[in-house]
Regions:
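Helix-to-loop junction immediately C-terminal to a conserved catalytic motif
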Residues: 11
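ABC ATPase NBD Q-loop/coupling interface
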Residues: 22-38, 106
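ABC-family P-loop ATPase nucleotide-binding domains
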Residues: 41, 51-128
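Walker B motif beta-strand of ABC-family P-loop ATPases
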Residues: 128-134
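Walker B catalytic motif
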Residues: 134-135, 142
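Helical segment within the ABC ATPase nucleotide-binding domain
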Residues: 144-157
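Conserved H-loop
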Residues: 158-166
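Conserved beta-strand-loop-alpha-helix hinge in the C-terminal portion
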Residues: 173, 182, 186-209
Length: 210
């Protein structure tokens, strides 16, 4: 327990209060920053249950998001043509068609499409810290492999990804550097992929019993 709470606290979602400690990204103290400011500093949260935004096309939403981030970094706004080229290339990596970009944000999307749309946003924003909150939940094997491909494409030495999951199966396609087990809101155990495999076989009881 506490995994999604941790993700939401780092991202600065309303409804949570930090009573002790600090949240830092590099040299930046995030505690008192608004969610939008944290996002501009490179924090990205892929929601467990992405919401619909009727009347706003995916392309409009994504370009506005990217433009906002570039403005905060004093970078020139991308032309519509240049952005469309980048968006279509990123969508293709996730097996999404150009027509997908014209649809309303998450409007009528399947569960798998919503999750892939979150990964699409991550690829375009290129955050320093991406938190994926149960992105694998409810996905069939094909969608899971596609999402994993997008995560692997994004991962490099200049960023960090926190994957929140209950299951080991995502790690069949993504090689983690560390596996942390949270119990009652605290990290109870840390290991590598072998730890995830052990949890899949033996459950969590042996951790709470020690």
């Amino acid at each position: 327990s506490g995994k999604s709470t941790l993700a939401n606290v780092i991202a600065g979602r309303p409804g949570y209060e930090i009573t002790e400690g600090q949240v830092r990204l590099g040299d930046i103290r995030l505690n008192q920053l608004e969610p939008e400011t944290r996002a501009h500093h490179g924090v990205f949260l892929a929601f467990q249950y992405p919401t619909e935004i009727p009347g706003v096309s995916n392309m409009e939403f994504l370009k506005a998001d990217v433009d906002s981030h570039r403005a905060e970094q004093n970078l020139e706004e991308l032309s519509t043509v240049e952005f469309m080229r980048l968006a279509r290339a990123a969508a293709e990596q996730l097996d999404l068609t150009p027509e997908f970009l014209k649809r309303g944000v998450n409007e009528g999307f399947s569960g798998g499409e919503k999750k892939r749309n979150e990964i699409l946003q991550m690829l375009l924003l290129e955050p320093k810290l991406a938190i994926l909150d149960e992105t694998d939940s409810g996905l069939d094997i094909d969608a899971l492999q596609t999402v994993a491909r997008g995560v692997n494409e994004f991962s490099n030495h200049d960023n960090c990804i926190v994957l929140v999951t209950h299951y080991q199966r995502l790690l069949d396609y993504i090689e983690p550097n560390y596996v942390h087990v949270m119990v009652d809101g605290k990290i109870a155990l840390t290991g590598d992929k072998k730890l995830a495999l052990e949890l899949e076989s033996n459950g969590y009881g042996w951790i709470t019993d020690t």
